[in-house]
């Protein structure tokens, strides 16, 4: 699944992990028009923000 297909607030991981730790789970945020990327924060640390392009492949099939 691509990051642009997720809704704001959806959880995802960057690798296919069956039972990820809190530090491996990201929350999709809003879209930054100037960078043309999506803001995403780590679940356990809201200050750990990363921006990903819309075609970034992410994984949502995990138990959390």
Regions found by a protein language model. Give the residues of each.
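Intrinsically disordered, low-complexity, charged/polar segments
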Residues: 45-64
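Short, solvent-exposed secondary-structure boundary/capping segments
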Residues: 34-43
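Short beta-strand-centered aromatic/proline hotspots
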Residues: 21-34
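Intrinsically disordered, low-complexity regions enriched in serine, threonine, proline
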Residues: 25, 39, 47-48
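A broad helix-preferring feature
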Residues: 9-11, 40
